[in-house]
Amino acid sequence: MLPMQGAPTYDDIVLKREMPVHKGGPDPEKEDRVMLTRHRVSRILFDTKFYDYPISLKPETFKNFGVLTTLRVGFSYLGSMFHKLPEDNLENFYINCFGRKLYSMFFEYYTENLWGRHPSEIDASWGAQRTKGLSIMGILKDFFGKLFKVKNRKVNTSLIEEFKYPKLGPGQLWDVTAAEVEKLGGTIIKNAKVTKLHKNADNVLTSLTYEKDGQEFTMEGDYFISSMPVKDLVGGMNDVPAEPARIAKGLPYRDYMTLGVLVPKINLVNKTNIKTINNIVPDCWVYVQDRNVKLGRFQIYNNWSPYMIKDLEHTVWI
């Protein structure tokens, strides 16, 4: 939908950073319809100290831990290797992957704070989806792969160091997608409630009925895509069998609040070797796993795209 950048971004120019560009691609300094390549930095803020996300084997990690905690983490992981727990919940899954000590430090409280449930009450399959195979062993393999410069090594998605991002943020991607759908003959209906689905003799969906502004409409189509929660979608259908309807009705949902704040500065010191505009911390995400605050994580939009902040030199958007 959005072509890759063919020239450096504003911050890469100012900081003289080299990032890959695509020959013939648009210049983000001149055009808006462009996808940027960004450096991925995400860290954990725990006990007022920064840790790599996911945890890495760097001297800074062990310095932050201290000798005693490092030993506890190591022996805890060894214990989890020889004594595997039944993976019938998320807590046991994390303990098997990282050891009980790391689990209690970085996963237990954060998970409960984010999802509103203790990990022991969440299915283990959720952990497999979230971590995508990441474990201490995976971190070790990645560490030695980098150390010995192993070519074509498989990189876990949680360890990827670059990502693609729309110049004006994710909303831009959906705006462009919507425009392309309509350009190709599709129809997008907003602020409407689907009330009935109509199928033919072969049980294929051919049309639907929806309500909008107090009126009822019927629409035919080859494909129907819904953006509403599955629970509400199934609840609005007229002929759902009892068992699927019961399952859909029981699906739990977790609401969260996103708050954008524009500030002149943040009181976090950039102690990394990564250059940034105004020397702010280079993180995209900061996962707050400190038990002293009721906060899951925060973004620093300056590091996602320099074009999303009006005064990049003097303000920070989090």
Label for each model-derived stretch:
Residues 3, 123-124, 260:
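A structural signal for the main folded, soluble domain(s) of proteins
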Residues 2-5, 98, 115, 237:
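A broad structural signal for alpha-helix termini and local helix breaks/kinks
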Residues 48, 94, 111, 177, ...:
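A residue-level signal for conserved active-site and pocket-lining positions in enzyme catalytic cores
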